[in-house]
Amino acid sequence: MLKKIKNLIYDNRDRHRILIKLTKGIAMSQSRNIDLVNPHSWEFSGFSQNGEDGIIDFLRNKLSANNQYFIEIGSADGIDNNTAWLLFARSYNGLMIDGNSNLTERAQRMVSSYSIGLRICNMFVTINSMKNIKAISKTLNPDVLSLDIDGNDYFIAQELFLQGFRPKIFVVEYNSTFGPENSITIIPDDEFNYLTKHK
């Protein structure tokens, strides 16, 4: 009974979060002055952290052909990520993967109802799980593939390409404090957990 009440509170809060983020994204997207050679002018954030919604939306509009499909590895609760704008505002289908079972359970309850073509999967992503992702993905050529797992990203990205994935737009988080001139990565670690490593 207590879990049902807790879920009801979370679900109500999440509905409001979605509405607020969608409204914010629409307002920000309408107020942009787009300069084709300045990616900063493409930015807006409804669901993303740093303007990715706008950049992805701008690039998506430039695709000559699209399949309305995304893959998000590191999807969290399905609301705060790089592809939620595509799901809620652009009617995309897709695959959302996260290693945290509590977050994927919340996403399953809230986000899955917005698209019959959305699959939410609880999976701790490692280099060895790429074949599983390949098996459950509807295509190897999604319009957008977003990778944000806060560790092992480089090695996961490398393995995705080795498995044949060819996204039209590929979004990978990086740590900007090292600057664009440096090529730095961690030692691959299949047990890497951002909750314990990023304290």
Model region roles, listed by residue range:
Residues E72, W85, Y92-N93, L140-L145, ...:
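Conserved acidic-Pro-Pro-aromatic motif
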Residues H40-I136, L140-P142, L147, S176:
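SAM cofactor-binding core of SAM-dependent methyltransferases
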Residues L19-A27, I71-A76, N122, F170-Y174:
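Short, functional N-terminal and low-complexity linear motifs
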Residues L2-D11, D35-V37, D53-F58, D150-L160:
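Short charge-dense sequence patches
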Residues M1, L8-N12, S115, N141, ...:
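Short, flexible coil/linker elements and helix-boundary hinge sites characteristic
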Residues M28, F47, G74, E181-N182:
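N-terminal, active-site-proximal structural segment of metallo-dependent hydrolase catalytic domains
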Residues M1-E43:
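Membrane-proximal basic amphipathic "stem/tether" segments
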Residues K3-K6, K21-K24, K62, K131-K134, ...:
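Context-gated lysine
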